[in-house]
A protein has these predicted regions:
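Short aromatic/hydrophobic "clamp" motif used to bind/position activated sugar donors
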Residues: 90
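A conserved acidic beta->alpha catalytic loop
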Residues: 27, 34, 42-51, 70-72, ...
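Glycine-rich, basic loop-to-helix element that forms the pyrophosphate-binding segment
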Residues: 68-85
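Short loop->beta transition adjacent to catalytic acidic/histidine clusters or analogous donor-positioning motifs
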Residues: 5-8, 29-40, 48, 60-64
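N-proximal low-complexity "stem/linker" segments adjacent to membrane-targeting elements
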Residues: 1-30
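Acidic helix N-cap motif at the loop->helix transition within catalytic regions
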Residues: 19-22, 47-55
Length: 97
């Protein structure tokens, strides 16, 4: 598939999804369209979600992790990631989908 359609910013809000987030990231990496950035916005997880995401980010610079200053809920978490988005297109993908 051609990548001429522009950058897609995939926003993934997360909270305590260490058990699911790796599969979510792998599903994005497996897409045929490769012009994307993944913005994982953590709502102050208490598990090792951060470590899982950062492990992927070490080998794929399209993956970016950020954590809220405090637990804020899904809407604020999505909006925080949206502020960082660089893409022409925005897609939302929950971390447990």
């Amino acid at each position: 598939m051609t990548n001429d359609y522009g950058l897609v910013s995939i926003i993934t809000p997360t909270w305590a999804c260490a058990g699911f987030i790796a599969e979510t990231i792998r599903s994005i990496q497996a897409q045929t369209y490769t012009n994307w950035e993944l913005l994982v916005q953590d709502d102050c997880s208490t598990d090792n979600t951060k470590e899982v995401v950062e492990l992927f980010a070490q080998s794929d610079n399209r993956i970016k992790y950020e954590c809220n200053d405090r637990n804020s809920g899904a809407a604020i978490t999505r909006n925080n990631a949206l502020k960082r988005a660089q893409g022409r297109w925005i897609a939302f993908l929950d971390s447990d989908d």
